[in-house]
Swiss-Prot record:
PROSITE patterns: GATASE_COBBQ (PS51274). It comes from the Bacteria. GO terms for biological process: cobalamin biosynthetic process. Residues 248-435 form the GATase cobBQ-type domain. This is Cobyric acid synthase. Signal peptide: none annotated. Pathway: Cofactor biosynthesis; adenosylcobalamin biosynthesis.
Amino acid sequence: MTTLMVQGTTSDAGKSTLVTALCRWLLRQGVAVVPFKPQNMALNSAVTADGGEIGRAQAVQAQACRLAPHTDMNPVLLKPNSDTGAQVIVHGRAVTSMNAVAYHDYKVIAMQAVLASHERLRQAYPVVMVEGAGSPAEINLRAGDIANMGFAEAVDCPVILIADINRGGVFAHLVGTLELLSPSEQARVKGFVINRFRGDIALLQPGLDWLEQRTGKPVLGVLPYVTDLHLEAEDAIDVRQAVKGERVLKVIVPVLPRISNHTDFDPLRLHPQVDLQFIGPGQPIPPADLIILPGSKSVRADLSQLRERGWDSAIARHLRYGGKLIGICGGLQMLGHEVHDPLGLEGAAGSSAGLGLLDYSTVLEAEKQLRNVAGTLGLEQAPVSGYEIHAGVTHGPGLEHPAVQLDDGRNDGAISADGQILATYLHGLFEGSQSCAALLRWAGLADAQAIDYEALRERDIERLADLVEQHLDTERLRQLCGVTADA
């Protein structure tokens, strides 16, 4: 049983992508491999079959391994709910919310959960492919580290270091990171991968030769800059658009400070008939066919921000002119009369007025609802599947006209009497081809195409594995993974 870890010189260096690529590449070799990330800080999450919660990137990596997502793949998940605090999720379950100082002390306990999960995976799979977090050279975070070299030292595993050349300074990033590690940590780094290179590789070769001579470590390969790869982002919002045709539906997503699960909108971003725009602070909401209020980790605080930015008035104007409006999860809660947080789960205890567009109110409760679900969309009776991640319980007459009839007998969400507003707790609403097409037709795109988003994701995973074959030193990678060429 082998554990191999990918660490990066910075955030967004390409760790998640490389782990996904290596997982599918190993699977092609006939090797049973499992993804693992000790600690993830992200507001994009997925629900496992047993009702736990892990980072979205690990769910994609599980797909690359053709495995069902499991809480052991990401034993510690931190979901920021303020500038200094986060909800701490261990083995898929919310433990508590902590500020940074309290969590630093808690990491001793968190490390026990990390090592227990890793050991279970190590016993079950020949290769555990691990993703680090941020950079291993953050001096202020090195004490008690459980996400990078602290974990690698604890389980005695080799490390690949990846850096993004597109942002500039790649040699400084690699050499500087290495210099800031301890001698034993430096010895763990078995090679470098340079990511997002564009241009003539021959012009880069002198730098690669210098890097190998300077560090005594091999460059395992140079991955090209890929412009049309569309796997879910771990945390940053991906604003890239697929090429659109002439007839498009204009969709606006207001970006609030604690937006969560914005990967909900990836299928729309890729849809050839949708012009998706994320609107940030200081930007007015332009005319659109559809506005979507996304999920939020701090609904009341984000409601306040929405009003401060004048977006509540823009939404009211949008509805007066006949536009359509969707609220997903936290967005659903914002559309009601009130949001109550008596326990202070998302900040100071109290209540906030919602937008009052649907006749219900929400109370935030300590027990989070986590489940994968399927059912029938009220629009066109289209099949729909997705997942719930929410602490709120919503009650009121507005729910008498549900958005979704779930297969387990429950109703979800609401559709307004005039048919302009749809609210749902379901994430992943647009991933199903039939449900996505039905929603786009409802929003005004009469000839909406059905796009197989799952097939697009699978295609991209295969492309990543191709890049490993074409651009990395696969023989050295096999050695690091402890597998033979004919495995």
